[in-house]
Amino acid sequence: MPHTDKKQSGLARLLGSASAGIMEIAVFHPVDTISKRLMSNHTKITSGQELNRVIFRDHFSEPLGKRLFTLFPGLGYAASYKVLQRVYKYGGQPFANEFLNKHYKKDFDNLFGEKTGKAMRSAAAGSLIGIGEIVLLPLDVLKIKRQTNPESFKGRGFIKILRDEGLFNLYRGWGWTAARNAPGSFALFGGNAFAKEYILGLKDYSQATWSQNFISSIVGACSSLIVSAPLDVIKTRIQNRNFDNPESGLRIVKNTLKNEGVTAFFKGLTPKLLTTGPKLVFSFALAQSLIPRFDNLLSK
């Protein structure tokens, strides 16, 4: 019996992925800020006081309520980037998957077998979409700078920064970003598909229940974060530099190995698995559950 999934409409994919992105940013933006600040920190943290200073920066001595509000820098950029990213990734991957199914299904099936071939097409489609995600890089750069290096903004808005710095500078690190996204998205969608195929035994992935989507999203998210961790550290350090003090990815790799050792490339992995992991699982499972439901509503 052929392993085929029911197709959803483009509008359903747009609504489902956008809803997942909006709900994710509302819940997880402060967590993302903490993770980015830990990854950008070059010193060893040996006490709770030092951790407090790294996370809250100049506001570390203020009351807890005020400190918590400082974890929402760059929310406008973050919201714009996250919603567009989720729409592009979660809504776009099915289109890439359909393209591969239409033109290369036989090749994948001959190479990997029918069941594994289906999962590999899903992974390959995710990788293609992940590489194309660099078009959104300027918003990601501004989001990270607002989270980790807010003084580089100096009161400037988006248009002023674009005029002052030039669009090219906002695409700084695009090669490293593509190199990170390709295996990361491959592992995300591939892990998700393999879990549905081999652990859950689903024939039509779109018919997965919320709990099944949750389980498969855990597998995909953990695989993605582990695979992309080293390149994610490099990408983050490229992007959080001052606009007037850029540093190449190769120089960052060299200096990191020299000053911090190879384990530095996995800095922030544990908090990222504990923080970004649930965030990615949440939005991925939500998008996979909402898209078929929106499709059913729109088809009535």
From Swiss-Prot:
GO terms for cellular component: mitochondrial inner membrane; mitochondrion. It comes from the Eukaryota. Gene3D superfamilies: Mitochondrial carrier domain (1.50.40.10). InterPro entries: Mito_GTP/GDP_Carrier, Mitochondrial_sb/sol_carrier, Mt_carrier_dom_sf. It is found in: Mitochondrion inner membrane. The chain crosses the membrane at residues 14-34, 85-101, 122-142, 173-189, 214-234, 268-285. Keywords: Membrane, Mitochondrion, Mitochondrion inner membrane, Repeat, Transmembrane, Transmembrane helix, Transport. Solcar repeats lie at residues 8-108, 117-198, 208-293. One of its GO terms (biological process) is guanine nucleotide transport. One of its GO terms (molecular function) is guanine nucleotide transmembrane transporter activity. It is a multi-pass membrane protein. Belongs to the mitochondrial carrier (TC 2.A.29) family. Mitochondrial GTP/GDP transporter required for GTP uptake and GDP exit from mitochondria. Involved in mitochondrial iron transport and essential for mitochondrial genome maintenance. This is Mitochondrial GTP/GDP carrier protein 1. It comes from Saccharomyces cerevisiae (strain ATCC 204508 / S288c).
